[in-house]
Design a protein with these regions (language model features):
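Single conserved hydrophobic/aromatic residue that forms the stacking wall/gate
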Residues: 1-8, 12
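A broadly used, surface-exposed interaction patch
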Residues: 13-23
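Alpha-helix N-cap and loop-to-helix initiation/capping positions
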Residues: 10, 47, 107-115, 141-148, ...
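Auxiliary Fe-S-binding modules of radical SAM enzymes
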Residues: 160, 168-265
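Conserved C-terminal portion of the radical SAM core fold
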Residues: 114-174, 191-216
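Short, small-residue-enriched loops and turns at beta-alpha junctions
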Residues: 39-43, 70-73, 137-142, 168-169, ...
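Conserved SAM/AdoMet-binding glycine-rich loop
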Residues: 25-113, 118-119, 124-125
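Structural recognition of alpha->loop->beta junctions
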Residues: 56-61, 148-163, 235, 239-246
Length: 265
């Protein structure tokens, strides 16, 4: 269940509501508390851990997934997650978005790729499952720039990767930039993006689990691209195209690979 609330009591309530909803249909299911939105490691240590413990106290919850920025992960918190991972499932997901510093500066991320690599390595070194998020199609990035992200990520000790297409959202600075300078943006059609994703994963270390190809924004907020496809429909199209192309993850892997660090191994 994705958790957005900052108050510990609200965390338990949100988690309990989610478990109750799904347990009607799946009574034996276990759950991971997903601290998804915003930066879920930016607070005092005691305040953060109280929220995590509140979520874990909910019956049926067996672990945590915590999304955050690569420049907001202190060693003290990683030590907490390392100890917790000995008894619960723990994954840390970092929003990288790009491996190019010029892009990170342009989109005002406020961190460098070196900081992303450092956070990933510190996390994996503690035997914690480590994931990354990447946006494909950011302005100023060529097709080869995008595919080279796969080369760079393949050398990192990542467990999982979530890919997202660039989406223009109403009221954002990027939407204004695209309206003023459309020539600086390439908004992929669904077919173009499917082939881009497959080219990307053919250069990606096969030990990295790709958890997602696309993301979905509320229709009333989305300007473009509007493909009219749900995530599962898009994934089915990717799988079909993979079969047609006889493609496979890692077929064109370029750099020496680095195996992900997995707990218990």
């Amino acid at each position: 269940t994705p958790i957005k609330s900052s108050a510990a009591s609200d965390v338990y309530k949100r988690q309990e509501e989610g478990v109750r909803f799904f347990s009607r249909k799946y009574p034996e299911m276990k759950y991971l508390a997903y601290f998804q939105a915003y930066t879920n490691t930016y607070d005092e240590l005691d305040s953060l851990t109280s929220k995590y413990e509140e979520a874990l106290a909910c019956p049926g919850v067996v672990g945590l997934i915590v999304g955050t920025r690569p420049d907001c992960m202190p060693d003290t918190l990683l030590d907490y997650f390392s100890a917790l991972s000995q008894k619960k499932f723990v994954m840390i997901e970092y929003g990288l978005e790009s491996t190019l510093d010029r892009t990170l500066t342009r989109i005002n991320r406020g961190h460098t790729h070196a900081e992303s690599e450092e956070a990933i390595r510190r996390t994996a070194a503690r035997n914690i499952y480590t994931g990354a998020h990447l946006i494909l199609g950011l302005p100023g990035e060529s097709r080869e720039d995008i595919l080279h992200h796969a080369d760079i990520l393949s050398a990192l000790p990542l467990t999982t990767l979530k890919l997202h297409q660039l989406q223009l959202i109403r009221g954002t600075r990027m939407a204004r930039e695209q309206a003023e300078h459309p020539e600086q943006f390439h908004l992929y059609t669904a077919d173009e993006y499917i082939d881009l994703v497959i080219d990307f994963i053919e250069r990606l270390n096969p030990s990295i689990v790709v958890e997602r190809f696309v993301s979905q924004s509320p229709k009333e907020l989305l300007i473009a691209p509007d493909w009219g496809l749900k995530n599962f429909e898009f994934t089915a199209k990717v799988n079909k195209r993979i079969s047609e192309r006889n493609a496979r993850q890692g077929r064109l892997l370029n750099p020496p690979s680095s195996e992900p660090v997995l707990p218990g191994m």
